[in-house]
Amino acid sequence: MSAKEKFASLSPAEFFKRNPELAGFPNPARALYQTVRELIENSLDATDVHGILPNIKITIDLIDESRQIYKVNVVDNGIGIPPQEVPNAFGRVLYSSKYVNRQTRGMYGLGVKAAVLYSQMHQDKPIEIETSPVNSKRLYTFKLKIDINKNEPIIVERGSVENNTGFHGTSVAISIPGDWPKAKSRIYEYIKRTYIITPYAEFIFKDPEGNVTYYPRLTNKIPKPPQEVKPHPYGVDREEIKIMINNLKRDYTIKEFLMSEFQSIGDTTADKILELVGLRPNKKVKNLTEEEITRLVETFKKYEDFRSPSADSLSVIGEDLIELGLKKIFNPDFTASITRKPKAYQGHPFIVEAGIAFGGSIPVGEEPIVLRYANKIPLIYDEKSDVIWKVVEELDWKRYGIESDQYQMVVMVHLCSTKIPYKSAGKESIAEVEDIEKEIKNALMEVARKLKLYLSEKRKEQEAKKKLLAYLKYVPEVSRSLAIFLASGNKELVPKYQGEIVEGLFKLISKKLDLINIEEYRKVYKVDSE
């Protein structure tokens, strides 16, 4: 007879401590990268979302060479964190300010806490936080750990000092085992790609080797921040409606509930919905049965006349900033970008943006350089499993003037949504949702058409140059004949006139063709005044 089974529950902290790879911490190299990423994303959400031009300083120091322990410190000038929220914000898994119906870089209330858990598994130093909210006269300091069994913060140390400098923002330092040589290229690439789409930010990065990289602010223009909106009927399920009902502050009728708590439902639409469900408009919403809630959700899914979800909850990068970032980093000959109109999937609004850069200083490769972004987060790992890569790979680039397998091109795609369909909690690749895939393809085709037009005009220009340059071989004969005609028999004037005619013709051709060194062409065609 088999032994009796033992049953037990796990706290969220214990679950992710046992399964760190699910949160993007499978090994020291990835853990170091993921820690940097999570802290930078928190800093950006604390700045640009609130209309603050980001100043972000990232430092990685090797503090224990024998054990390869690194200290990652990120400092921002954001809104800061209320001191009463700091312990839970950093010490309770699945506790977050990002459980709202608007676009955020974070989603799960997991990121930085996963770094703390990984840190605790391998060394004993607590996470260190310094923060001062906007207009606060105090600077608050904390040292924290996580009680893994209880999923609660352990406050190792806390204090506050007078804030005499007017500083507002947050500094977070985490000591973590890492592999800098293996993580180095990914971390540098992540910061560079973040800068491409946030050219309004300033980044200073000091790596463990002592190298300092400065990314200057290129503009003071910040994209419109996302606004929190009510849920769309298409995007809710039974349990979400039950939670909404339980959280109501007053005793609504079902019609009042529909009109006040959802977007896209006005008086007429509410009446139509309730008629389809078979509910009286004046029935108290808290008296709904389980079966009635089920019918309501099913009606939501089938109803075809809802307005599309509001895009106010989204924040795009914008075409100007996309091209500004691409030009700064890649120095191309050509850039184009597009911000598509809002669409929706499963009741969640989304917008696709695309950019393309061609030629110039872009290195030639067998594949284009693909920059993937989701809610303004660069996606560095798992590239080939992402829907963006799938669309780029399947697009017939030859139709758009790319005639060889040697690409000198950067392709950028940004997806923003209130719900990004990531393949895992590590947030590195986007799933193949049909509506999203279609929009990505449409966006890329649109910028590809702009590239095709540019390449077509460039080829026509080159052909025109060839034809005009072909006429150079006639310059000596034509200039001499004109000089003889103008000299009217005075042979001494012929060289003078011929020289003036040659110079005039070459100035005209040089201006017409925008040639920098016309002398090289004079040597080729042996055109000199006599």
Swiss-Prot record:
CDD domains: HATPase_TopVIB-like, TopoIIB_Trans
EC number annotated for this UniProt entry: 5.6.2.2
Keywords: ATP-binding, DNA-binding, Isomerase, Nucleotide-binding, Topoisomerase
One of the GO biological process terms: DNA topological change
InterPro entries (UniProt xref): HATPase_C_sf, Ribosomal_Su5_D2-typ_SF, Ribosomal_uS13-like_H2TH, Ribsml_uS5_D2-typ_fold_subgr, TopoVI_B, TopoVI_B_transducer
UniProt: ATP binding residues: 42, 76, 97-98, 106-113, 427
The organism's place on the tree of life at top rank: Archaea
Cellular component terms per the entry's GO annotation: cytosol; small ribosomal subunit
GO MF assignments: ATP binding; DNA binding; DNA topoisomerase type II (double strand cut, ATP-hydrolyzing) activity
Reaction(s) the record says it catalyses: ATP-dependent breakage, passage and rejoining of double-stranded DNA
Family that this chain belongs to: Belongs to the TOP6B family.
Purpose of the protein: Relaxes both positive and negative superturns and exhibits a strong decatenase activity.
PANTHER family given in the database record: DNA TOPOISOMERASE 6 SUBUNIT B
HAMAP family: Top6B (MF_00322)
Subunit and interaction comment: Homodimer. Heterotetramer of two Top6A and two Top6B chains.
Protein's name according to its UniProt entry: Type 2 DNA topoisomerase 6 subunit B
Organism this protein belongs to: Saccharolobus solfataricus (strain ATCC 35092 / DSM 1617 / JCM 11322 / P2)
Origin organism lineage: Archaea, Thermoproteota, Thermoprotei, Sulfolobales, Sulfolobaceae
Gene: top6B
